[in-house]
């Protein structure tokens, strides 16, 4: 499971690209690329815990359930605060809301001992990892701790004149909508191009 998590994390980290917004298409593309880089054994094991579904199927799950009573505690997990130098530290953690790093690290700790967990616990924490890795690589989800980023911006593309959009929605939806009319698989084909040796170096991590 530890190798499985590393593959998920590295796949999303190194194949995420600013061309995405992180609505459904962005999250599913990140998950699709991660899925393509899983071993057959890891993929089979993950899908066992996910009820036969792929990680792509659950890529957007956290957004769909964050406002439900059962998962309301995860509502603050979708962003991560940084200081003026773009550095994160645990001192920036709001203990009442948590953040993406807190949620991701918590899920990884549980999954490292997945054999001791119930199937439902493994499943929900896999869903957290699948989604939060994507969120962590969307610019709108990394926020200055002293700034809430709740404002509108003018966004113009080749199809429309400048319109006001909530800044978060520009990254989540508008950019991908106007950049290419591609399917999730087509995005994955275009972005998942690193040679095997580079992928192995990435998965090895850094000290």
Spans of features found by a protein language model:
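Sec-dependent signal peptide recognition
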Residues: 2-8
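Cleavable N-terminal signal peptides
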Residues: 8-9, 19
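N-terminal, motif-rich segments that launch catalysis or mediate targeting to/interaction with membranes
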Residues: 20-132, 139-207
């Amino acid at each position: 499971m530890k190798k499985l998590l590393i593959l998920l994390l590295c796949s999303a980290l190194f194949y995420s690209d600013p061309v995405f917004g992180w609505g459904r298409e962005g999250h599913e593309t990140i998950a699709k690329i991660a899925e393509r880089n899983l071993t057959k054994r890891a993929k089979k094991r993950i899908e066992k815990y996910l009820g036969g579904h792929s990680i792509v199927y659950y890529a957007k799950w956290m957004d769909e359930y964050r406002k439900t009573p059962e998962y309301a505690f995860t509502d603050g997990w979708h962003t991560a605060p940084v200081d003026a130098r773009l550095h994160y530290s645990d001192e920036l953690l709001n203990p009442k809301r948590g953040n993406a790093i807190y949620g991701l690290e918590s899920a990884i700790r549980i999954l490292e001992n997945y054999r001791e967990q119930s199937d439902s616990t493994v499943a929900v924490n896999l869903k957290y990892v699948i989604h939060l890795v994507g969120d962590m690589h969307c610019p709108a989800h990394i926020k200055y701790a002293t700034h809430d980023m709740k404002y509108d911006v003018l966004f113009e593309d080749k199809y429309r004149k400048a319109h006001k959009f909530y800044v978060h929605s520009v990254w989540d939806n508008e950019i991908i909508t106007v950049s290419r009319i591609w399917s999730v698989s087509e995005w994955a084909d275009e972005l998942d191009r690193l040679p095997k040796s580079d992928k192995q170096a990435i998965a090895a991590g850094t000290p």
